[in-house]
A protein has these predicted regions:
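Compact integral membrane and secretory-pathway proteins
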Residues: 1-144
Length: 144
């Protein structure tokens, strides 16, 4: 993979992730909530993930792992562990239906919006990048 292509893939991941944080992600059953943007889900999920037993927030870690894989060679064990954790947390994120709040009430997610689906695409693309970069580095030099 050429350096230019790696940069383009890296920028696509960064821009896609930034857009997923800017776009509306979910709506809850609370009367006072409109569409919650992705950045709010990132902050709320990061701070209060332990109040609702969910690990889906940790799928966000696949993005910096993919960017690192585009830049530096990763050991196979690290890539395998990253892919496994991303798969588990992504499944959990897709099953996710509650949001913790600051007033100790758990709100139910009633609808997902484009920010959530773009986030899922970026996380899956990041996992694919990690897997492919490991595979490419394991091939003989003439087969890339």
């Amino acid at each position: 993979m050429t350096p230019t292509r790696r940069r383009l893939i890296g920028w696509a991941i960064v821009i896609g992730y930034a857009l997923s944080l800017a776009l509306p992600a979910v709506q809850t059953d609370a009367a006072d909530t409109a569409r919650m943007p992705g950045w709010m889900m990132l902050v709320v999920g990061g701070v209060f993930w332990w109040t609702v037993p969910t690990i889906g927030w940790f799928a966000n870690l696949s993005v910096p792992t993919a960017l690192a894989a585009l830049r530096w060679p990763l050991p196979r064990w690290f890539s395998a562990l990253s892919l496994l954790l991303t798969a588990v947390t992504l499944v959990e994120a897709c099953r996710w239906s509650t949001i913790p709040t600051t007033n100790k009430v758990v709100e139910t997610v009633t609808r997902h919006y484009s920010g959530f689906y773009l986030w899922v695409v970026v996380v899956v693309a990041s996992a694919i990048v990690v897997g492919l970069r490991t595979r490419w580095q394991g091939q003989p030099a003439g087969t890339r």
